[in-house]
């Protein structure tokens, strides 16, 4: 199936925002060791947070879930190896900004500069509205090597062969990001410690950074002040590890939440609100300072998987973050 044309605009094009027509999809989840002995409703509310518990119970009552082909109920227990299938009756993917540009292309890899509202991988309600789908339609089988959150703009690398993907994954990279944060960030900080679950947050996936910590996942981020504004700061972040939400959680825990971040910003209840209601109000966005999180993948340096040549790519700060600098 082809993505809608002309949704994709490449170098020199204008961003395109377009809804994909309704498609019939079955979403399957294979139960692994981590979810063994969980109830169906526990799995749905923990792993798929774009609906609240009431929303998932309505879907279950409507008969939209099966376990290995048999009707599922909320309290059914899932065992390792089972398959939970979701047969949504009205799945419409939210609109996103489908714009991306190809910065470099050869037979081994692609370097992509993506918009700040484009999921990379299929997950939850997103399938056709993903960078993976758009690129796979054009280039065939692809292997994203470094991932960015939906609302993180900028550079990422996609391998075009399994061999290139393996070599790139094994290589050491240099990654630099720009983050616009609340408050005045004035000193260079080598933030080395650990990331653990933030048990004080109602959002289970939220993490917090512990400086010098040894429990959880080890992480290290070099944070450097780039420019100060009246109420915000532009911070350059250089990664030495690549943990989930590393920059966002680290800056939040240090007292510098990202502008526009629903989860690691000024109020994480806005993350829950958007998950339940599907959108936020203009007042909410005014509070956040931007409609998406102000994080941009600005510099990537790596070795080409076939030639061994060092390659460096730069992406300028996008206009929406520039407008939010104040």
Regions found by a protein language model. Name each.
Residues 1-326:
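RNA pseudouridine synthases
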């Amino acid at each position: 199936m082809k993505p809608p044309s002309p949704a994709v605009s490449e170098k020199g094009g204008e961003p395109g925002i377009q809804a994909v027509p309704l498609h019939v999809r079955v979403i399957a989840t294979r139960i692994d060791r981590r979810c063994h002995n969980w109830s169906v409703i526990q799995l749905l509310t923990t792993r798929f947070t774009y609906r609240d518990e009431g929303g998932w119970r309505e879907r279950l009552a409507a008969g939209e879930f099966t376990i290995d082909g048999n009707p599922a109920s909320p309290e059914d227990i899932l065992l390792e190896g089972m398959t939970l299938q979701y047969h949504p009756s009205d799945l419409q993917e939210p609109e996103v900004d489908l714009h991306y540009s190809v910065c470099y292309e050869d037979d081994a890899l692609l370097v992509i500069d993506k918009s700040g509202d484009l999921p990379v991988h299929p997950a939850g309600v997103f399938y056709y509205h993903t960078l993976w789908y758009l690129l796979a339609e054009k280039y065939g089988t692809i292997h994203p090597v470094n991932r960015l959150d939906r609302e993180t703009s900028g550079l990422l690398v996609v391998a075009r062969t399994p061999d290139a993907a393996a070599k790139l994954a094994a290589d050491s990279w240099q990654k630099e990001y720009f983050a616009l944060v609340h408050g005045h960030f004035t000193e260079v900080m080598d933030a080395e410690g650990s990331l653990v679950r933030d048990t004080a947050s109602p959002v289970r996936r939220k993490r917090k950074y512990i400086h010098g910590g040894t429990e959880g996942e080890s992480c290290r981020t070099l944070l450097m002040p780039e420019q100060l504004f009246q109420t915000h700061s532009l911070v350059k972040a250089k990664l030495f590890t690549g943990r989930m939400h590393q920059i966002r959680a680290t800056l939040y825990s240090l007292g510098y939440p990202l502008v526009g971040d629903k989860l690691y910003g000024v109020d994480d209840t806005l993350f829950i609100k958007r998950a339940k209601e599907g959108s936020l109000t203009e007042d909410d966005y005014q509070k956040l300072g931007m409609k998406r999180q102000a994080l941009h993948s600005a510099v990537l340096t790596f070795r080409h998987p076939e030639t061994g040549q060092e390659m460096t790519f730069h992406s300028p700060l996008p206009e929406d973050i520039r407008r939010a600098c104040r």
